[in-house]
């Protein structure tokens, strides 16, 4: 318990080797000193963050339950981790990647507190973690080499390394990696006529996915204090993705034939960002600049044959699609914050962002003679530009040692134009208020209540039509799409359990207008597509339980963490006019249970995960994804020396399959003439991995930095 403490006013009297908590943070944060994490033998700051009791890493708005999304601007994309009290000036590099670049030896402590302690970007968040780094001069680093064996016998290898060099107030952090991740799976598709139940077609498939994301990143910082700092960072990643699919098709009543799906994507990204903080009028003035440049050069090919490859069957048709796009973003931001202005904490700021997307899609049908015929899409060539601005002010006041109120108002405005195959010009303006009440009623209990208005951003790619050859469909475009608006209500209650464990309960309700989903789109020629559009009012209610329990009384080093969510989403379907769930990853229930034990030289554990199926409600199909059982992974890690760790892990230990069930309506659900069910079963089988981790530098690899280290 000596490693865990609630901060007091004395915390401000830190040595020069240990940055002090900011004024007003005392008594509102839980501090975990470096010695607390020694039992887990962390190698990076990410390992430490993942071991903070009751804490779950939030990667920010660009990484959501729906996957990676394009969120423009800087203010609305924060996660829930800061480093030395500041947010990293990057968007291309996610929080987990940034944290994995920091050697654990450099971490003195972490501070867990409510979001208002760390600025307006985190207002309303019940938990934000501050990773405090050592100021001791020296060099620390890590090298990680991994190998994973797939069921085919293929072994994927990957290596990456990082180093942190500190001299006085200056810190340089560099990292690089091969970013190799090849995955293999096999499975079957069965298509049946719903009206008769008869099998129409059977397919046997083998897929090979290969992500090659080598990267080089570097960051330089000079920190003389919370109000005197400079940071510069950059990242280059020439991303590649390749898919090769073998597909043996057996139509009922017709001969077998072999098809192939080949995807070749080249999507490089480069980013340069930085910030400068200077004292002004008793507070801190901060400038942030960020420039990101992305390219897409994607080619999909579907090859059809008249028979089997082994019989030298010729190609008798197919499809080919190419996507060439440039996506650029430039951001400038200025903020001024003061911890005590007439008895209030105060922050005000402004942000400007300029975004462009230049995108061209070519979708071709290839006949048996190799002749290409262009398939007309509603919008296949367009240039999208957006000028976005936002100004805001946030105020907070501690009314008593146990009660604090924070509130703010954001004003967002943007001008968006579309040219090319479609023409649009619109100006959007929104007010976004927020209010948070943080209350500690006593007895170790902590609660937080918040309400805020949010406005979603339009995905630029929703303005461009595109085909998906893996499922033989086209998604239409919509130049008239509107951003959905929501009022979000949150309530959180937490309490320590079993010493350094935590009980946490989160409740939430979202009231959404103009919910973004799929609607029926008709082009000028009368062709009908499923595409992005706005529905009516949507509602979401959820409850999330987190139990992080140290069970050392039962068995030394034993710890169990359970996270479970129940939720309900409702919206009126645009075709049936019945209430249904939202499209996307909004499962009715999901859970994650991890059990691990840590000793001085050995750690081992097991993790269980599952969720209810989720559905994408298109106008021409119901596309459902599901697990066919619980997914289980296990690991054991041995540390033969203080600087070395060997990790052996088993993924998908129960050989659980995943599935996709597509209910297809021809031509669409509005007036179907035929309905088919396509059930896809996929299995990646068990995977065994071995990872070697080695630390170097002034501190050992089995402990984080201690005071004065």
Regions found by a protein language model. Give the residues of each.
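Face-selective signature of the C-terminal outer-membrane beta-barrel domain
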Residues: 217-239, 263-420, 440, 542-565
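Surface-exposed extracellular loop regions of Gram-negative outer-membrane beta-barrel proteins
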Residues: 295, 415, 439, 443-489, ...
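C-terminal beta-barrel architecture of Gram-negative outer-membrane proteins
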Residues: 162, 457, 562-571, 582-640, ...
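Outer membrane beta-barrel strand-and-loop segments of large Gram-negative receptors
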Residues: 329-333, 478, 482, 495, ...
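C-terminal beta-signal and adjacent terminal beta-strands/loops
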Residues: 13-15, 612-615, 638-709
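Short acidic/polar hinge/loop motifs at secondary-structure boundaries
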Residues: 86-114, 161, 218
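A beta-strand signature from Gram-negative outer-membrane beta-barrel systems
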Residues: 102-140, 695-700
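Extracytoplasmic beta-strand/coil segments of soluble accessory domains associated
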Residues: 46-87, 128
